[in-house]
């Protein structure tokens, strides 16, 4: 019986299962499947805003199957990219039918996800099909993931175009790629820099994971550049690591720093934004 249980779930790794919450501990939850088998959802595999009570129905993906003291242990996950992919398969028939392919998924569970999709049929808009009329298809997925923001991106093998799409909603001016180092320098208008970075830096971090490049954003130069002062001029008054952090998110001049809010500056762990502005 144990061998059958082990084999059943070993063959279901990567698939969605539905079960009932049976017992709740500090670091994990026990789920019972429809046959009364015990499955484990560790806290680290839960979305931060997940909250379950005994008797609740829940869905997760089978992450792995282990043997523990000769007993099968089934580990579930709600944070794995595969969970999001299976949810899309349930909501979007074109994916299950093979008309749309999910090329890659990256997630910051509960915060944001980026899903690159592609269709070999020119008559199908893969992004529109995944989102659905007025968001009808994606809304259910977002609710399941506790309001995780999901960006569906039309995949392309053109890296520059893929970077541009993955940084949406920011409007990119130009991109310089270094294939040897795997770095991409992205230039944007000043008012687009914070959009590219996103709340908590999630947008730029996920875009980098999606395309496989380290993305650095820079404020686009303009006619007022000669009235501005390069941050390097403040090296005697501002710690070098702070200047490097600011440059890393596209803030390379005094004016660009002044245009940022205290909240945005705090994202890079600057504890005294007021003092920084005064300098």
Residue ranges of predicted features:
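RNA-contacting regions in translation and RNA-metabolism proteins
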Residues: 1-275
